[in-house]
Amino acid sequence: MSKKILILPGDGIGHEIVAEAVKVLEHVNVRHTLNMRLSFDALGGAAYEKYGSPLADETLARAREADAVLLGAVGGPQWDTIDPALRPERGLLKIRAQLGLFANLRPALLYPQLADASTLKPEVVAGLDILIVRELTGGLYFGQPRGSRISKNGEREAFDTLPYCESEIRRILKVGFEMARLRGKKLCSVDKANVLASSQLWRTVAGEMAKDYPDVTLSHMYVDNAAMQLVRYPKQFDVIVTENMFGDILSDQASMLTGSIGMLPSASLDANNKGMYEPCHGSAPDIAGQGVANPLATILSVAMLLRYGMGYIKTADAIEYAVGVVLDSGLRTADIWSEGMTKVGTVAMGDAVVAAL
Protein backbone atom coordinates (compact mmCIF):
# COMPACT_ATOMS: atom_id res chain seq x y z
CA MET A 1 0.00 0.00 0.00
CA SER A 2 1.43 3.37 -1.01
CA LYS A 3 2.12 6.22 1.39
CA LYS A 4 0.70 9.63 0.48
CA ILE A 5 2.80 12.74 1.06
CA LEU A 6 1.30 16.19 0.52
CA ILE A 7 3.84 18.85 -0.48
CA LEU A 8 3.07 22.49 0.42
CA PRO A 9 5.91 24.73 -0.87
CA GLY A 10 4.36 27.89 0.58
CA ASP A 11 5.85 31.32 -0.06
CA GLY A 12 9.17 33.10 -0.53
CA ILE A 13 12.04 30.63 -0.78
CA GLY A 14 9.62 27.80 -0.09
CA HIS A 15 9.40 26.67 -3.71
CA GLU A 16 13.19 26.68 -4.13
CA ILE A 17 14.05 24.68 -1.03
CA VAL A 18 11.14 22.26 -1.37
CA ALA A 19 12.18 21.49 -4.95
CA GLU A 20 15.52 20.19 -3.63
CA ALA A 21 13.84 18.19 -0.87
CA VAL A 22 11.53 16.62 -3.45
CA LYS A 23 14.60 15.59 -5.46
CA VAL A 24 15.83 13.71 -2.41
CA LEU A 25 12.42 12.18 -1.73
CA GLU A 26 12.03 11.00 -5.30
CA HIS A 27 15.55 9.56 -5.31
CA VAL A 28 15.11 7.49 -2.14
CA ASN A 29 11.57 6.56 -3.17
CA VAL A 30 12.94 4.79 -6.23
CA ARG A 31 16.22 3.53 -4.78
CA HIS A 32 14.69 2.11 -1.60
CA THR A 33 11.34 1.10 -3.19
CA LEU A 34 9.37 3.08 -0.62
CA ASN A 35 6.14 3.29 -2.68
CA MET A 36 5.40 6.92 -1.76
CA ARG A 37 3.03 9.09 -3.82
CA LEU A 38 3.67 12.84 -3.81
CA SER A 39 1.05 15.51 -4.47
CA PHE A 40 1.23 19.31 -4.29
CA ASP A 41 -0.97 22.16 -3.09
CA ALA A 42 -0.76 25.72 -1.74
CA LEU A 43 -0.59 27.14 1.79
CA GLY A 44 -0.13 30.65 3.14
CA GLY A 45 0.15 33.59 0.78
CA ALA A 46 0.18 31.33 -2.26
CA ALA A 47 -3.12 29.82 -1.11
CA TYR A 48 -4.58 33.28 -0.50
CA GLU A 49 -3.77 34.22 -4.09
CA LYS A 50 -5.12 30.93 -5.46
CA TYR A 51 -8.11 30.25 -3.23
CA GLY A 52 -8.77 33.51 -1.36
CA SER A 53 -7.85 31.82 1.92
CA PRO A 54 -4.47 30.96 3.51
CA LEU A 55 -5.75 27.40 3.98
CA ALA A 56 -8.44 26.16 1.61
CA ASP A 57 -10.91 23.55 2.83
CA GLU A 58 -9.87 21.17 0.05
CA THR A 59 -6.21 21.54 1.02
CA LEU A 60 -7.03 20.73 4.63
CA ALA A 61 -8.98 17.67 3.49
CA ARG A 62 -5.99 16.49 1.44
CA ALA A 63 -3.71 17.02 4.43
CA ARG A 64 -6.00 14.89 6.60
CA GLU A 65 -5.88 12.09 4.03
CA ALA A 66 -2.09 12.23 3.64
CA ASP A 67 0.29 10.10 5.68
CA ALA A 68 2.60 13.10 6.06
CA VAL A 69 2.87 16.73 4.98
CA LEU A 70 6.08 18.47 3.86
CA LEU A 71 5.99 22.27 4.13
CA GLY A 72 8.37 24.94 2.86
CA ALA A 73 7.66 28.28 4.56
CA VAL A 74 4.88 30.87 4.60
CA GLY A 75 4.62 34.64 4.70
CA GLY A 76 5.78 37.74 2.88
CA PRO A 77 5.50 41.55 3.08
CA GLN A 78 2.95 41.70 0.26
CA TRP A 79 0.34 40.24 2.62
CA ASP A 80 1.14 42.36 5.67
CA THR A 81 -1.73 44.78 5.10
CA ILE A 82 -4.57 42.33 4.39
CA ASP A 83 -7.17 41.22 6.93
CA PRO A 84 -5.24 39.54 9.79
CA ALA A 85 -7.52 36.50 9.53
CA LEU A 86 -6.35 35.99 5.93
CA ARG A 87 -2.62 36.44 6.43
CA PRO A 88 -0.34 33.51 5.50
CA GLU A 89 0.59 32.73 9.10
CA ARG A 90 -3.05 32.09 9.99
CA GLY A 91 -3.10 29.27 7.47
CA LEU A 92 -0.11 27.67 9.16
CA LEU A 93 -1.64 28.01 12.62
CA LYS A 94 -4.94 26.61 11.36
CA ILE A 95 -3.47 23.52 9.70
CA ARG A 96 -1.49 22.74 12.85
CA ALA A 97 -4.60 23.07 14.99
CA GLN A 98 -6.95 21.20 12.63
CA LEU A 99 -4.54 18.28 12.25
CA GLY A 100 -3.96 18.17 16.00
CA LEU A 101 -0.22 18.73 15.62
CA PHE A 102 0.46 19.60 19.23
CA ALA A 103 4.09 18.42 19.54
CA ASN A 104 6.83 20.31 17.71
CA LEU A 105 10.27 18.66 17.72
CA ARG A 106 13.14 20.99 16.87
CA PRO A 107 16.64 19.53 17.02
CA ALA A 108 19.60 21.88 17.39
CA LEU A 109 22.47 19.71 16.23
CA LEU A 110 25.88 21.14 15.37
CA TYR A 111 27.59 19.37 12.51
CA PRO A 112 31.30 19.29 13.40
CA GLN A 113 32.09 20.63 9.93
CA LEU A 114 30.24 23.85 10.85
CA ALA A 115 31.76 24.53 14.28
CA ASP A 116 33.33 27.73 12.93
CA ALA A 117 29.98 28.96 11.59
CA SER A 118 28.50 29.36 15.07
CA THR A 119 28.60 32.79 16.67
CA LEU A 120 29.90 31.12 19.85
CA LYS A 121 33.40 29.78 20.43
CA PRO A 122 33.93 26.27 18.99
CA GLU A 123 34.73 24.85 22.42
CA VAL A 124 31.35 26.10 23.72
CA VAL A 125 29.27 24.49 20.98
CA ALA A 126 31.34 21.46 19.95
CA GLY A 127 29.19 18.34 20.23
CA LEU A 128 25.98 20.35 20.67
CA ASP A 129 22.88 18.15 20.37
CA ILE A 130 19.67 19.61 21.86
CA LEU A 131 16.06 18.68 21.17
CA ILE A 132 13.42 21.32 21.89
CA VAL A 133 9.89 19.95 22.36
CA ARG A 134 7.42 22.81 21.90
CA GLU A 135 3.67 22.73 22.56
CA LEU A 136 2.14 23.92 19.32
CA THR A 137 -1.63 24.29 19.48
CA GLY A 138 -2.34 26.07 22.77
CA GLY A 139 -1.23 29.07 24.75
CA LEU A 140 -0.95 32.67 23.66
CA TYR A 141 -1.16 32.07 19.90
CA PHE A 142 -4.58 30.44 20.16
CA GLY A 143 -6.02 31.78 23.42
CA GLN A 144 -9.34 33.61 23.54
CA PRO A 145 -10.35 36.33 24.05
CA ARG A 146 -7.96 38.31 21.89
CA GLY A 147 -8.37 41.50 19.96
CA SER A 148 -8.11 45.27 20.08
CA ARG A 149 -10.37 48.04 21.29
CA ILE A 150 -10.50 51.61 22.46
CA SER A 151 -10.06 51.81 26.22
CA LYS A 152 -12.19 53.91 28.56
CA ASN A 153 -9.66 56.73 28.44
CA GLY A 154 -9.69 56.74 24.62
CA GLU A 155 -6.41 54.92 24.02
CA ARG A 156 -5.95 52.09 21.56
CA GLU A 157 -5.53 48.83 23.46
CA ALA A 158 -4.77 45.24 22.40
CA PHE A 159 -4.98 42.05 24.42
CA ASP A 160 -4.19 38.33 24.23
CA THR A 161 -4.88 35.37 26.53
CA LEU A 162 -2.50 32.59 27.63
CA PRO A 163 -4.58 29.55 28.68
CA TYR A 164 -3.43 25.97 29.21
CA CYS A 165 -5.53 23.09 30.51
CA GLU A 166 -4.03 20.12 32.31
CA SER A 167 -4.58 17.67 29.45
CA GLU A 168 -2.71 19.93 27.01
CA ILE A 169 0.20 20.17 29.43
CA ARG A 170 0.28 16.45 30.17
CA ARG A 171 0.36 15.34 26.54
CA ILE A 172 3.29 17.59 25.58
CA LEU A 173 5.21 16.76 28.77
CA LYS A 174 4.73 13.08 27.94
CA VAL A 175 6.44 13.66 24.59
CA GLY A 176 9.25 15.48 26.39
CA PHE A 177 9.76 12.68 28.90
CA GLU A 178 9.61 9.99 26.20
CA MET A 179 12.15 11.81 24.01
CA ALA A 180 14.46 12.31 26.99
CA ARG A 181 14.19 8.61 27.78
CA LEU A 182 15.39 7.83 24.23
CA ARG A 183 18.29 10.27 24.46
CA GLY A 184 20.38 11.42 27.43
CA LYS A 185 17.63 11.00 30.07
CA LYS A 186 17.67 14.69 31.02
CA LEU A 187 14.58 16.87 30.65
CA CYS A 188 14.50 20.61 31.34
CA SER A 189 10.99 22.05 31.63
CA VAL A 190 11.00 25.77 30.82
CA ASP A 191 8.30 28.07 32.18
CA LYS A 192 7.69 31.42 33.89
CA ALA A 193 6.13 30.05 37.06
CA ASN A 194 7.25 33.03 39.14
CA VAL A 195 4.81 35.25 37.20
CA LEU A 196 2.30 33.28 35.11
CA ALA A 197 -0.55 31.17 36.46
CA SER A 198 -0.40 28.92 33.38
CA SER A 199 3.27 28.25 34.10
CA GLN A 200 2.53 27.44 37.73
CA LEU A 201 0.12 24.72 36.59
CA TRP A 202 2.70 23.57 34.03
CA ARG A 203 5.39 23.17 36.70
CA THR A 204 3.02 21.35 39.06
CA VAL A 205 1.98 18.86 36.39
CA ALA A 206 5.61 18.29 35.34
CA GLY A 207 6.52 17.42 38.92
CA GLU A 208 3.62 14.98 39.16
CA MET A 209 4.53 13.25 35.91
CA ALA A 210 8.21 12.90 36.85
CA LYS A 211 7.21 10.10 39.24
CA ASP A 212 6.31 7.97 36.20
CA TYR A 213 9.76 8.50 34.67
CA PRO A 214 12.25 7.67 37.45
CA ASP A 215 14.99 7.11 34.86
CA VAL A 216 14.69 10.71 33.57
CA THR A 217 16.17 13.61 35.53
CA LEU A 218 13.71 16.53 35.49
CA SER A 219 14.81 20.12 36.06
CA HIS A 220 12.88 23.38 35.88
CA MET A 221 14.12 26.69 34.51
CA TYR A 222 12.54 30.12 34.02
CA VAL A 223 12.45 31.09 30.36
CA ASP A 224 14.62 34.19 30.77
CA ASN A 225 17.32 32.13 32.48
CA ALA A 226 16.99 29.42 29.82
CA ALA A 227 17.64 31.99 27.10
CA MET A 228 20.79 33.08 28.89
CA GLN A 229 21.96 29.52 29.59
CA LEU A 230 21.54 28.56 25.94
CA VAL A 231 24.22 31.11 25.11
CA ARG A 232 26.40 30.62 28.19
CA TYR A 233 26.60 26.82 28.30
CA PRO A 234 24.25 25.17 25.79
CA LYS A 235 25.66 21.66 26.22
CA GLN A 236 24.04 21.41 29.67
CA PHE A 237 20.75 20.71 27.87
CA ASP A 238 19.55 17.46 26.33
CA VAL A 239 15.77 17.80 25.88
CA ILE A 240 13.92 21.05 26.59
CA VAL A 241 10.12 21.00 26.83
CA THR A 242 8.11 24.21 26.92
CA GLU A 243 4.92 26.00 25.94
CA ASN A 244 4.12 27.52 22.56
CA MET A 245 5.52 31.05 22.63
CA PHE A 246 8.56 30.21 24.77
CA GLY A 247 9.37 27.34 22.42
CA ASP A 248 8.99 29.55 19.37
CA ILE A 249 11.57 31.99 20.71
CA LEU A 250 14.02 29.53 22.29
CA SER A 251 14.15 27.24 19.27
CA ASP A 252 15.07 30.15 16.99
CA GLN A 253 17.73 31.20 19.48
CA ALA A 254 19.08 27.64 19.67
CA SER A 255 19.21 27.46 15.90
CA MET A 256 21.88 30.14 15.73
CA LEU A 257 24.11 28.13 18.05
CA THR A 258 24.50 25.76 15.12
CA GLY A 259 25.67 28.46 12.72
CA SER A 260 22.54 28.88 10.64
CA ILE A 261 18.82 28.35 10.98
CA GLY A 262 19.10 27.06 7.42
CA MET A 263 20.41 23.77 8.85
CA LEU A 264 17.56 22.95 11.22
CA PRO A 265 14.54 20.75 10.46
CA SER A 266 11.41 20.27 12.53
CA ALA A 267 8.56 17.83 12.97
CA SER A 268 5.06 18.62 14.22
CA LEU A 269 3.27 15.47 15.37
CA ASP A 270 -0.18 14.42 16.49
CA ALA A 271 -0.96 11.80 19.12
CA ASN A 272 -0.31 9.00 16.58
CA ASN A 273 2.98 10.41 15.25
CA LYS A 274 1.34 11.55 12.01
CA GLY A 275 2.72 14.94 11.20
CA MET A 276 3.92 17.89 9.20
CA TYR A 277 7.60 18.47 8.54
CA GLU A 278 9.22 21.80 7.77
CA PRO A 279 12.45 23.77 8.13
CA CYS A 280 12.71 25.98 11.21
CA HIS A 281 13.43 29.08 9.14
CA GLY A 282 10.93 31.42 7.53
CA SER A 283 10.15 32.33 3.94
CA ALA A 284 13.10 34.78 3.62
CA PRO A 285 11.47 37.02 1.01
CA ASP A 286 14.65 39.12 0.83
CA ILE A 287 16.49 36.29 -0.97
CA ALA A 288 13.56 34.59 -2.70
CA GLY A 289 14.19 33.84 -6.35
CA GLN A 290 17.95 34.34 -6.10
CA GLY A 291 18.84 30.65 -5.90
CA VAL A 292 20.99 31.10 -2.79
CA ALA A 293 18.75 29.69 -0.03
CA ASN A 294 20.05 26.76 2.00
CA PRO A 295 17.87 23.67 1.30
CA LEU A 296 19.52 21.45 3.93
CA ALA A 297 16.96 22.14 6.68
CA THR A 298 14.19 21.05 4.33
CA ILE A 299 16.16 18.00 3.20
CA LEU A 300 16.76 17.09 6.84
CA SER A 301 13.02 17.58 7.42
CA VAL A 302 12.53 14.84 4.82
CA ALA A 303 14.75 12.63 6.97
CA MET A 304 12.54 13.39 9.99
CA LEU A 305 9.45 12.63 7.89
CA LEU A 306 10.84 9.24 6.92
CA ARG A 307 11.95 8.50 10.49
CA TYR A 308 8.88 9.58 12.47
CA GLY A 309 6.13 9.50 9.86
CA MET A 310 7.00 6.40 7.85
CA GLY A 311 9.31 4.36 10.06
CA TYR A 312 12.01 4.24 7.38
CA ILE A 313 14.87 4.61 9.84
CA LYS A 314 17.69 3.42 7.56
CA THR A 315 16.63 5.74 4.76
CA ALA A 316 16.47 8.67 7.18
CA ASP A 317 19.94 7.79 8.44
CA ALA A 318 21.21 7.67 4.85
CA ILE A 319 19.95 11.19 4.13
CA GLU A 320 21.51 12.61 7.29
CA TYR A 321 24.78 10.84 6.46
CA ALA A 322 24.69 12.24 2.91
CA VAL A 323 24.36 15.78 4.27
CA GLY A 324 27.47 15.15 6.37
CA VAL A 325 29.33 13.87 3.30
CA VAL A 326 28.43 17.03 1.37
CA LEU A 327 29.63 19.24 4.21
CA ASP A 328 32.85 17.20 4.39
CA SER A 329 33.40 17.98 0.72
CA GLY A 330 33.51 21.70 1.52
CA LEU A 331 30.31 22.74 -0.25
CA ARG A 332 28.47 25.58 1.49
CA THR A 333 25.52 27.84 0.77
CA ALA A 334 26.07 31.50 1.58
CA ASP A 335 24.62 31.32 5.09
CA ILE A 336 27.17 28.72 6.25
CA TRP A 337 30.09 29.67 4.00
CA SER A 338 33.52 30.39 5.48
CA GLU A 339 36.97 31.06 4.05
CA GLY A 340 38.36 28.09 2.13
CA MET A 341 34.95 26.54 1.43
CA THR A 342 33.19 26.34 -1.95
CA LYS A 343 30.08 28.51 -2.17
CA VAL A 344 27.18 26.93 -4.05
CA GLY A 345 23.54 27.75 -4.66
CA THR A 346 20.31 26.02 -3.73
CA VAL A 347 20.13 23.66 -6.71
CA ALA A 348 23.80 22.64 -6.55
CA MET A 349 23.48 21.82 -2.86
CA GLY A 350 20.43 19.65 -3.50
CA ASP A 351 22.18 17.90 -6.38
CA ALA A 352 25.19 17.22 -4.15
CA VAL A 353 23.04 15.52 -1.51
CA VAL A 354 21.37 13.33 -4.13
CA ALA A 355 24.80 12.42 -5.52
CA ALA A 356 26.00 11.51 -2.01
CA LEU A 357 23.03 9.17 -1.63
From Swiss-Prot:
User: Where does the UniProt annotation locate this protein?
Assistant: Cytoplasm
Q: Which GO terms describe its molecular function?
A: 3-isopropylmalate dehydrogenase activity; magnesium ion binding; NAD binding
Q: What is its EC number?
A: 1.1.1.85
Q: Which SUPFAM superfamilies match?
A: Isocitrate/Isopropylmalate dehydrogenase-like
Domain of life, per UniProt, equals Bacteria
Q: Which UniProt keywords apply?
A: Amino-acid biosynthesis, Branched-chain amino acid biosynthesis, Cytoplasm, Leucine biosynthesis, Magnesium, Manganese, Metal-binding, NAD, Oxidoreductase
| Residues with site note (Important for catalysis) | Y141, K192
- Catalytic reaction equation(s): (2R,3S)-3-isopropylmalate + NAD(+) = 4-methyl-2-oxopentanoate + CO2 + NADH
Q: Which Pfam families is this protein grouped with?
A: Iso_dh
- Keyword Glycoprotein among record annotations: no
* Keyword Translocase appears in the UniProt entry: no
Q: In which pathway does it act?
A: Amino-acid biosynthesis; L-leucine biosynthesis; L-leucine from 3-methyl-2-oxobutanoate: step 3/4
Q: How does it assemble?
A: Homodimer.
Quote the protein name from its UniProt record. Answer: 3-isopropylmalate dehydrogenase
